[in-house]
Amino acid sequence: MLREFVPEPAYSTTDDDTVYALLSRRAQKNPDDLIAQWQDDETRQWHDVTAGQMLARVRAVALGLIGLGVKDGSMVVIYSPTCYEWGVVDFACAAIGAVSVPIYETDSAKQAASIVEEV
């Protein structure tokens, strides 16, 4: 009995096709482009982030993850509400080939535990 079917890939990708590569190319081409905004929880003020600033932050976080022993293929659990920092960590994971595994603040304790057990 057939238990698993893995179809041939519809197309191939390269390192130039990753979300990190897209960010990197954009930052190199137009570093001053507005790419994100975030709101300070205390002051409620909005802050602009340029492509160059975001790339620098992503690279810094990626280096920190590497320093913690994260490498290509590692799984990194991100427990956070949706925010700018979540995106930075997600891009940093992509930059080093790690897999980001989100746990959302709306997930129940049981759901979160199940996700962590799988990792």
Language-model-detected regions and their locations in the chain:
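Conserved AMP-binding/adenylate-forming core of the ANL superfamily
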Residues: A36-F91, S108-A113, E117
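Short beta->alpha connector loops at strand-helix junctions that form conserved
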Residues: I103-T106
